[in-house]
C-alpha cells in the first residue's frame, strides 16, 4: 500500500454510502446483506457511526455501529476486502470507532461474532474486549459470541 489509508466517518446513511457498503459487503462476506436489509437495519438508528477505510479512491474496509442504549454502542458489522487483509486496517477501523464513540459519550462497546470468524474474535480480544456470553439464534446453527469493552 503506497498511498495513505484514510478513514472517513459518517453519521447518516446516504444512497452513495449505501452503495459503498454494498460493494464492500460483496467483497467481504459469502452471503452479503442486501440494500434493503442494510437500509432497514440502519435507516433511522440513533447514534449511527459508519466508518469506511479508503486506499486512494478504493474503499477497502468498513465498520458500522449504533446506539444500543445511552451508555452502550453496538458495533454491528464490518470487514476488510480480501486483498487488503493483514495490513492492520481492521484494527485501525476498530480503534477509530472506539475513539469516536467515546467522544460521543458512550462508556461501553458491545459486539458479537461467530466462532468461524476467528480473526475477528482474536482482534476483539486483543483490543481489550471480554467474552460476556453466547446467544443462539433460532435460524442459525452456530452460536454468537457476545463481547464487551469498557471505553
Q: Language-model segments: what does each one mean?
A:
Residues 1-16, 149-151:
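Conserved N-terminal entry element of GNAT/NAT acetyltransferase domains
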Residues 110-114, 125-146:
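Conserved catalytic-core motifs of GNAT/GCN5-like acyltransferases
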Amino acid at each position: 500500500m503506497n498511498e495513505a489509508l484514510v478513514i472517513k466517518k459518517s453519521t447518516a446513511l446516504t444512497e452513495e454510502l449505501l452503495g459503498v457498503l454494498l460493494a464492500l459487503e460483496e467483497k467481504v462476506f459469502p452471503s452479503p446483506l442486501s440494500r434493503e436489509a442494510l437500509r432497514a437495519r440502519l435507516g433511522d438508528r440513533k447514534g449511527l457511526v459508519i466508518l469506511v477505510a479508503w486506499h486512494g479512491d478504493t474503499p477497502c474496509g468498513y465498520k458500522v455501529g449504533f446506539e444500543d442504549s445511552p451508555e452502550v454502542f453496538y458495533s454491528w458489522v464490518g470487514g476488510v476486502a480480501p486483498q487488503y487483509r493483514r495490513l492492520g486496517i481492521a484494527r485501525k477501523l476498530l480503534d477509530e470507532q472506539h475513539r469516536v464513540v467515546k467522544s460521543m459519550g458512550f462508556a461501553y462497546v458491545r459486539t458479537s461474532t461467530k466462532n468461524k470468524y476467528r480473526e475477528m474474535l482474536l482482534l476483539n480480544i486483543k483490543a481489550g474486549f471480554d467474552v460476556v456470553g453466547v446467544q443462539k439464534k433460532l435460524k442459525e446453527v452456530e452460536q454468537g459470541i457476545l463481547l464487551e469493552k469498557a471505553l
